[in-house]
Amino acid sequence: MDVVILDTGCANLSSVTYAVQRLGYTPVISRDPAVVLRADKLFMPGVGTAHAAMEQLRQRELIELIKSCTQPVLGICLGMQLLATSSEESGGITTLGMIDAPVKKMTDFGLPLPHMGWNQITAQAGNHLFRGIPDGTYFYFVHGYAMPICPNTIAQTNYGEPFTAAVEKDNFFGVQFHPERSGAAGAQLMKNFLEM
């Protein structure tokens, strides 16, 4: 199986690479359209600001390439946020628009921001991405912006208020947390994605 980690220019690709390798796969890091479109599974990790990430995608001519993908794509952290229509970050920017929902600055409910550390998720019953992962399982989060609950939400987390922890639309999946840093539960989620 061809597993590709998209070289977005805005991510720590090594931790995702190692996590995929531990599951017995040999991922390729690439931004070559031929390699990306031939992939059976595509990971889209991202860290940093949405503005800088979209600029990297623009410079690398990846925006239309991502939108044209028909295989399962998993956006991780900022990679998930980029699937939204817009982000309030950097004064408001347009993002990829696969999920019809915005990403908003998290509200200060007296809890430390950014939201950093382990938190529990509640997943949609029977969703394939969360197979074998019980409700209440902890995943590792690092973010100050979040997608509100929307029709494409498949898992949510509460941090002062509920927000989208995972999203799915057609072949596009996204997780706000870092599965590659979430121990056995994160490995199970990545395995579920790779076995779709």
Swiss-Prot record:
It comes from the Bacteria. Gene3D superfamilies: 3.40.50.880. GO terms for biological process: L-histidine biosynthetic process. The active site is at 77 (nucleophile), 178, 180. Keywords: Amino-acid biosynthesis, Cytoplasm, Glutamine amidotransferase, Histidine biosynthesis, Hydrolase, Lyase. It is found in: Cytoplasm. GO terms for cellular component: cytoplasm. Residues 2-196 form the Glutamine amidotransferase type-1 domain. Its EC number is 4.3.2.10, 3.5.1.2. GO terms for molecular function: glutaminase activity; imidazoleglycerol-phosphate synthase activity; lyase activity. Pathway: Amino-acid biosynthesis; L-histidine biosynthesis; L-histidine from 5-phospho-alpha-D-ribose 1-diphosphate: step 5/9. It holds the Pfam family GATase. It catalyses: 5-[(5-phospho-1-deoxy-D-ribulos-1-ylimino)methylamino]-1-(5-phospho-beta-D-ribosyl)imidazole-4-carboxamide + L-glutamine = D-erythro-1-(imidazol-4-yl)glycerol 3-phosphate + 5-amino-1-(5-phospho-beta-D-ribosyl)imidazole-4-carboxamide + L-glutamate + H(+); L-glutamine + H2O = L-glutamate + NH4(+). SUPFAM superfamilies: Class I glutamine amidotransferase-like. InterPro entries: Class_I_gatase-like, GATASE, Imidazole-glycPsynth_HisH. IGPS catalyzes the conversion of PRFAR and glutamine to IGP, AICAR and glutamate. The HisH subunit catalyzes the hydrolysis of glutamine to glutamate and ammonia as part of the synthesis of IGP and AICAR. The resulting ammonia molecule is channeled to the active site of HisF. Heterodimer of HisH and HisF. This is Imidazole glycerol phosphate synthase subunit HisH. It comes from Yersinia pestis. The gene is hisH.
